[in-house]
C-alpha cells in the first residue's frame, strides 16, 4: 500500500512540531534556492518560528533590495487599483509589512556588528563578510579622501602664512631702514644747530682829527712828549664807524 495523504493540521506535540518545522524549513529554503538557480528568479523567503525567530533566504543576500522592489511593485499596483485605505484590514496589512521590514533591518544591523550570527549558514556568513569588506573599502576610501583634502587645505594655509611672514619681514626691514635714516638726519641737524660760527668783525674806521700823538718811550718806561691831560684826551678819543662818519660829514 502506498503512503496515505497526510492531513494538514496543527501538530499538537511540541517536540514533533519543532522537528517538523526544522525539516520543512530546510526543505523550503532548499526549494527556494533551487528555483532561484534553475529559473534565474529573484527569490526572497521569510519564515518566523513559533518563538519569533526569523529565518530568511534571498538569492543575492540582499533582502532589503527585494523588499524595496516589492514595496515599489505594491505601490504601483495600489495606484492602478484604488483601495479603501481607511478600512481596518488595509491598515493591519500595512502595519504588518512595516513591522516585518523593521525586524529585517534590525536583524541585519545586529549582523553588521557581529551579533546574532548563530542563525546564519556558511554561505550567508560569506555574503555578510563580503558586504562588510566592501563597506570597509568604501569607508577607507572616504577616509583617505578626507585626509588628502585636509592635507591640501593645511598646505595652502602654510603657504599663505609663509607669504604673509615674508611680507611682514620685508616691511620690518624697510621700517628699520627708515628709522636709521631718520636718526642719521636728526643727528646731523643737531650737530648743525649746536655749532657756533664766530665771524670776525673788523671795522676799518678812520680817526676823527688827531686822536693820538706820537710818544717816545724812554728806558725807564716813562712817556715823553706830552702831559697827562693830553694822554687822557687821547685815551678818550673814540673810533667812529663809517656810517657815523657819513652822518657827521653830511
Swiss-Prot record:
Keywords, A to Z? DNA-binding, Nucleus, Transcription, Transcription regulation
Ranges for the K-box domain? 88-178
A GO biological process this protein is involved in? Answer: regulation of transcription by RNA polymerase II
Domain of life here? Eukaryota
The cross-references to Gene3D superfamilies, in alphabetical order and at most eight, read: Transcription factor, MADS-box
Expression tissues? Abundant in vegetative organs.
List where in the cell it is found: Nucleus
Q: Name one GO molecular function term.
A: DNA-binding transcription factor activity, RNA polymerase II-specific
Transmembrane ranges?
none
Where is the MADS-box domain positioned along the sequence?
Answer: 3-57
One cellular component (GO) term of this entry: nucleus
UniProt-listed InterPro entries: MADS-box/MEF2_TF, MEF2-like_N, TF_Kbox, TF_MADSbox, TF_MADSbox_sf
User: What is known about what this protein does?
Assistant: Probable transcription factor.
List the protein's name: Agamous-like MADS-box protein AGL8 homolog
